[in-house]
Amino acid sequence: MSGYQHELPPNISKTSPAPEEAREELLQQCEAIWKQMEECQSKLTMSGPETLPETDVQLYLLMMQVKALTAEYEQWQKRTPEIISDNQDVLLAVGKEELEKIAQELEMVLSSVQAKNKKLKKDLEKEQNWLDGQQKIVDALTSRQDELKNQLTAFSEKRVYQDIAGKLYKVRAHKEELLSALGDFLEEHFPLPQEQENQSKKKKGQSGKKSVQLMTLHEILEILINKLMTTPHDPYLVLEPHHWPPYIEMLLRYGIALRHPEDPKRIRLEAFHQ
C-alpha cells in the first residue's frame, strides 16, 4: 500500500448500490449522450456516400482527412471541461477509483525502479571490485618500475666495465687452462720424433749445416688457432721445413685443417665455432 492511501475517503462497497439520485442523474446523462450520437448517425446516413474524383483520389482523401482533423481540433479548442456529475457521492467514488489506479501504477513503477536499482548496485559492486583489482596491478607495476629505475641508476658504467673485465679474465684463464691441457695431451701422445732429431744431429756433424728445429703439434695448433681468431680474413699458415709433414697430413686427414684451394703450401684451421 502506498504512503498516501490512508488519506483516501472510506471505501464505497461495490455491492451496495449508489444513492438513487446519483444513479438517476447518471442514467439521464447517458441517455442524453446516446440521443446526440443517434442524431449524428442519422445525419451521416442522410448525407449519403460522397463521390470521389476520378483523378488524385489519394490527394483528395488526404485533404478530407486534414479538414476533419482541423474541425476536430477547433471543436476541442472551443470545448470547456465538463464535470461528470454534480453529485458528491459520484465524484467521490470516481475520484477514489482513479486514485487507486494511480496508486497501483505508481507501486508497479516503484517496484520496477527498486529492481533496477538493486541490479545497478550489483553491477556497481562488480565494477568496483574489478577497478580495485586493476588498481592493485597498477600499483604493483609502478612499484616494480621504481625499483628497476633505482637499480638502473645504481648500475654505473664503472660497474659494467668491471663485470666485463672480470668475465674476460675468466675466459682468458679458461683458455689458458684448455691450451695447457691440450699441450700436455699432445706432448704425451704426439711427441717429436727422436730419430729425426738424432739423424739431424749426425748430418749436422758430417756436413756442418744447421739442423732444422721441428715445431711441436701443440705449437702448430696454437698458431692456427691464433690466426683464425685474430685474422679471420686470412687464417692461413704457410708451411715451412720446421712443420713436420706427418703432423700436417694427420691434421688434414682428420678434417682439423684445410688446404688453400689455390696454394697447397698454405693451410688453415677448420672453423668449428661457426
UniProtKB/Swiss-Prot annotation:
Disulphide linkage map: none
Region of interest (Disordered), ranges: 1-21
UniProt-annotated location(s): Nucleus; Chromosome, Centromere; Chromosome, Centromere, Kinetochore
Coiled coil: 96-159
Pfam families recorded: CENP-K
One GO term (biological process): mitotic sister chromatid segregation
Gene Ontology cellular component annotations, sorted alphabetically: kinetochore; nucleus
InterPro entries in UniProt: Centromere_CenpK
Keyword Lipoprotein belongs to the record: no
Keywords: Centromere, Chromosome, Coiled coil, Kinetochore, Nucleus
PANTHER family, alphabetized: CENTROMERE PROTEIN K
Function as written in the Swiss-Prot or TrEMBL entry: Probable component of a centromeric complex involved in assembly of kinetochore proteins, mitotic progression and chromosome segregation.
Similarity comment: family membership: Belongs to the CENP-K/MCM22 family.
Protein name: Centromere protein K
Protein's organism: Xenopus laevis
Phylogenetic placement of the source organism: Eukaryota, Metazoa, Chordata, Craniata, Vertebrata
